[in-house]
Structure formats: structure tokens, C-alpha cells
Amino acid sequence: MEGLSPGQGNNTTSSEGPFGTRGNATGISDVTFSYQVITSLLLGTLIFCAVLGNACVVAAIALERSLQNVANYLIGSLAVTDLMVSVLVLPMAALYQVLNKWTLGQVTCDLFIALDVLCCTSSILHLCAIALDRYWAITDPIDYVNKRTPRRAAALISLTWLIGFLISIPPMLGWRTPEDRSDPDACTISKDHGYTIYSTFGAFYIPLLLMLVLYGRIFRAARFRIRKTVKKAERKGADARSGVSPAPQPRKSVNGEPGGREWRQGPGSKAGGPLCTNGAVRRGDDGAALEVIEVHRVGSSKEHLPLPSEAGAIPCAPASFEKKNERNAEAKRKMALARERKTVKTLGIIMGTFILCWLPFFIVALVLPFCESSCHMPTLLGAIINWLGYSNSLLNPVIYAYFNKDFQNAFKKIVRCKFCRRR
């Protein structure tokens, strides 16, 4: 968003322009040819990469059927929004930055500011919509499967654009100060104090708080599931070490009841270790081995499977079995830890990139209108902060799509033109 105009990072009569050029009384700087060339190359590269990256995401979702689901519809809509930023907003912003003054007239300036605020706000709110969708998916997976419909995605997308529209239109309807249009060489957003609070909180601070809460809860829910899986595996390992194994299914029933069986105390514990028998063995409370004896009807008599004697019993070999269980439990613990680290890393990248790109801009956008006479913002720093926010439109497709293996496969198909051959 165009909160700081080039050359107007401060309001002093002798301000430093970009790359050390000297400003005049209005803060507009004459720039050198080398500055214009370097700035044009840097900003041109940024715009080209942003257009290419977001266009590839849109093409991948449109061409690859496996990517056509509600979660990816939101990512696709984010890519369309960032593509609009890259095509409709960034070229005019780059021209303004390179020339260091506005040359396209007041009407175009109003349109530029409105598009800037609309598209950038919608892009930020799309990140909230994606966070909300992920939160519902992980905290209510069973019910949300039926609720996660294209219609719901369309409602979320429409809401992002509606809020963006409500934030971008007021300055065009007069919510601005007279000084906002006093300089024909400058094009800046309204510095009205009421609008400043309304726009910065609506476009950034409230969405930021919402994303922090949602991703915090997503992390807690994911960590709970991961640790629950580990505990379940550890319980299974403990059961195996304590000597519990499932009894074999009986072939016949006793007295008409399938699976007739009875428990008898056996001599396993007295022999100094578990004994292998023809029944399932478990430990009693007193440490004695209890052996399940399958009872079968043979003719008219009931026969019990013979209990093995202490001397003739075949000793089991639980050591290797227990070691295997311990290895499996340890492997699951390591996998769970790796998954937890990956969750932290992913959420850290998402929130870290968003905050890094937009927080400096919105701090300046909120503070500067309230201290115009006393605040000093170097012009170069103002330009860097401004374009750091714009660069979020370049980084979004990298974070939300290029790290996804399904998207990577679709991109490879696009590069190899496999979609063209299929048609």
C-alpha cells in the first residue's frame, strides 16, 4: 500500500532523497540516472517474478484436477489477488518510485490508491481465510469434511473483497484531509486520523491478531494429536513387554457360546520367566502367569488342552520381541518430533514472512499521520518499507504453493508442457 510516497519519507525542507540525493522544499527529490536504472532493474525483476509465480499457481490449479479442492481454491484466489497487485498496482508504484514524483494526474492517483488498498487488503485477508479454513479442518475434521464446500470457499473469498472494498472506498468519498491533494507531484493515502486508525486496524492489525490466534490453536491441536499418537504407541509397547498377547480364536463353542474359554493360573512365573504354551498368556496381579485354555466339545465329553509342566515347557524368547517394540516406539517418537518440528517450521515461515513484510509498513502508516511535524523518516528507508510490503505478493505463492509437492508436480508438467500434449 502506498502509505509513504517516494521522496516524502519525512517532512523537513531539506530531506535526503533515495540513494543520497537531496530533496527540495516539498520533499520531492531530483534523482540521478544511475538511481533510475538500478531501481528499474530491481523493481522490474520483482514485478516479473511476482507475475510469473502467481500465474503459475493459477494455471496449476486450473489444469491439474488433483489440485481442484476447497483448500486450493483459497490458495488460487490468493494467487489471483496477488496477480492483480502485480499487474494493476506495482507498475504504477514502480514508475512513481523511479521518477520520484507522481506524473499521472490526480484522477489516476485516486484510482491507484483505491486499487492499492483494495488488492493489498484483500491479499492479507486471504491469508486469514486460509488460516481459518485450516483451523476448522484440524480442530473439527469429521464435521468439517461436509461443510468444506466450494460455496463456503466462495463466501470466504467474497468476504475478503467486501472488507477490502469498504476500506479502500472512503477516501474517494471524501474521508481525507485537504493537505492530501495539495502537492500535485505526490500521491499518498489519506492521512485523516480517523481513516488511518480505521484502515490500518481493518487491513492489518485485526487480521494479524486473528492469524496469531488461529495458528496458535492449530499448532496446539497438531501437537496434541502427534503426542497422543506417541502415547498410544508407547502403551502398546508397554503391554507387549508385560506379556499380554491376544488369544487365538476358538474353532468351536461351549454350551452354545462362541469363544468359550477359562483362565487358569499356571506355573509360568515360578519358572523364572514366561513359558510358551498353546494358549494366550497374560500376567496376573500377583505376577503369576495366567493361561487361557480353549475348551472344545469333542463328542459328548469336554476336554481341556493339557497344561504344560514346568519342566517340559518351552521357554519364550521375549528379549528380541521387546527390543523390536522399543525400537518401534523410539522410531515413532522421532517421527512425531520431526512432525512437530515441521509444524513449527511451517507456521513460523507463514507468520514470520507475513509479519516481516507488513508490520514495518503498518507501524509507519499508523504513527506517521499523528506526528508529521516531529517524525523523521529517511526517504530510502520509507521506500524499502513500502516495497517490503509489496514483496509479500511475490512470497505468498512460494510459501503456500511451491512448498507443496502436489503443486511442484503440476509445475513440472507446466514446464514440460505435458498439459499441451494431453490436449
Curated annotation (Swiss-Prot):
Keyword Cell inner membrane (UniProt): no
Residue ranges, compositional bias (Polar residues): 7-16
Keywords for the protein's UniProt record, in alphabetical order: Behavior, Cell membrane, Cell projection, Disulfide bond, G-protein coupled receptor, Glycoprotein, Membrane, Receptor, Transducer, Transmembrane, Transmembrane helix
Short sequence motif named DRY motif, residue ranges: 133-135
A GO term, aspect molecular function: G protein-coupled serotonin receptor activity
Disulphide bridges, residue numbers: C109-C187
Stretches assigned to the Cytoplasmic side: 60-73, 133-152, 217-346, 404-423
Subunit comment: Heterodimer; heterodimerizes with GPER1. Interacts with YIF1B. Interacts with GPR39 and GALR1.
Protein name: 5-hydroxytryptamine receptor 1A
Native species: Vulpes vulpes
